[in-house]
Swiss-Prot record:
Pfam families for the chain: XPG_I, XPG_N
Region of interest (N-domain), residue spans: 1-104
Gene field: fen1
GO CC terms in record: mitochondrion; nucleolus; nucleoplasm
Subunit structure: Interacts with PCNA. Three molecules of fen1 bind to one PCNA trimer with each molecule binding to one PCNA monomer. PCNA stimulates the nuclease activity without altering cleavage specificity.
Name by which UniProt lists this protein: Flap endonuclease 1
Details of cofactor binding: Binds 2 magnesium ions per subunit. They probably participate in the reaction catalyzed by the enzyme. May bind an additional third magnesium ion after substrate binding.
Needed cofactors: Mg(2+)
Localization per record: Nucleus, Nucleolus; Nucleus, Nucleoplasm; Mitochondrion
InterPro entries noted in UniProt: 5-3_exonuclease, 5-3_exonuclease_C_sf, Flap_endonuc, HhH2, PIN-like_dom_sf, XPG-I_dom, XPG/Rad2, XPG_CS
Length: 382
């Protein structure tokens, strides 16, 4: 689920923290991608006649097709992806997982009724609700990535937390996931829609955590408490406190404990056995990989290995797989060139007030020298 309503709240309260870019803007960038989120997207979206793709043996192949072609697309644009797979879910997530099981059981009943009534649209809708990423899906995608020469990381716990840790350690530029809790886990940069279908034509949304906190007027600990109030996978929320009220209360009282001491508990009852402290600890000190010992290597694809796995075993078209392997090999060279801004380090900065003063003085001098001729326009590279 991530954090309920966080993206909209940021758009409303801290819109300057969100930038929109085309995929071409990420040439030379290393990005940690939430693998489970991607695989789930592929199982939902990569379909034929409303059903997941299958080979002649009845094995699902939607995840492999999605992983193969979306990864090639990123590499063709000079992006170096590293996929991060979920480990064991934290104990605190058991309540959320139980709710998901209940929703699946309900969807199964509704699917059965839709099939009996011959309701095609509802059959497709409820089939999608039953989609679940399995261990086999994960293992097959890991095998595929290895053959493609793309690194992956097995997170000890939540993938988003390890993605965030890799960004904080400087191993990658950003965490790519649809789950907003990557920000709560502390990723400095979050990318949404990076692995979305090209047909959707969605711009990539880039969220900057420091700007979010600056414009909201909160510290990271206060931001975590705000996310807990909005609703996460790890504990319940206080009923009646929506996003607007939550941020107002955090700004006023600074922590959940202070909020609880100052609100009308009859109007806003606290959940029984509320685990907000444990949720806070999980966000602030999650179980993640040792980033220092984590080596990320992008190597040449194994074309023959890809053909053996994807064609002989999974029954994909050999021409298409070989063509994809050649694209990987060709574009791997391009993505190793890196970005210009990797070679230049900013040694200092000036405040926005000072910058405006400098710019206004500079423009005044320029006008005097050029006798008011229009200045040329330029775009500063990123």
């Amino acid at each position: 689920m991530g954090i309920h309503g966080l993206a909209k709240l940021i758009a409303d309260v801290a819109p300057a923290a969100i930038k929109e870019h085309d995929i071409k803007s990420y040439f030379g960038r290393k990005v940690a991608v939430d693998a489970s989120m991607c695989i789930y997207q592929f199982l939902i979206a990569v379909r034929q006649d409303g059903n997941m793709l299958q080979n002649e043996d009845g094995e699902t192949t939607s995840h492999l097709m999605g992983m193969f072609y979306r990864t090639i697309r990123m590499i063709e644009h000079g992006i170096k992806p590293v996929y991060v797979f979920d480990g064991k879910p934290p104990q605190m997530k058991s309540g959320e997982l139980a709710k998901r099981s209940e929703r699946r059981a309900e969807a199964e009943k509704l699917l059965e009724a839709a099939e009996e009534a011959g309701e095609v649209e509802n059959i497709e809708k409820f089939n999608k609700r039953l989609v679940k990423v399995t261990k086999q899906h994960n293992e097959e995608c890991k095998k595929l990535l290895t053959l493609m020469g793309v690194p992956y990381v097995d997170a000890p716990c939540e993938a988003e937390a390890t993605c965030a840790a890799l960004v904080k350690a400087g191993k990658v530029y950003a965490a790519a996931t649809e789950d907003m809790d990557a920000l709560t886990f502390g990723t400095p940069v979050l990318l949404r829609h990076l692995t979305a279908s090209e047909a959707k034509k969605l711009p990539i949304q880039e969220f900057h955590l420091n700007r979010v906190m600056q414009d909201m007027g909160v510290s990271h600990e206060q931001f975590v408490d705000l996310c807990i109030l909005l609703g996460s996978d790890y504990c319940e929320t206080i009923r009646g406190i929506g996003p607007k009220r939550a941020i107002d209360l955090i700004r006023q009282h600074k922590s959940i404990e202070e909020i609880v001491d100052n609100i009308d508990l009859k109007k806003y009852p606290i959940p029984e056995n509320w685990l907000h402290k444990e949720a806070r600890q999980l966000f602030l000190e999650p179980e993640v990989v040792d980033t220092e010992s984590t080596e990320l290597k992008w190597i040449e694809p194994d074309e023959e290995g890809l053909v053996a796995f994807m064609c002989a075993e999974k029954q994909f078209s050999e021409d298409r797989i070989r063509n994809g392997a050649k694209k990987l090999a060709k574009n791997r060279q391009g993505s190793t060139q890196g970005r210009l801004d990797d070679f230049f380090k900013v040694t200092g900065s000036i405040s926005s007030t000072k910058r405006k003063e400098v710019e206004s003085k500079g423009s005044a001098k320029k006008k005097a020298k050029t006798a008011g001729t229009p200045a040329g326009k330029f775009k500063r590279g990123k």
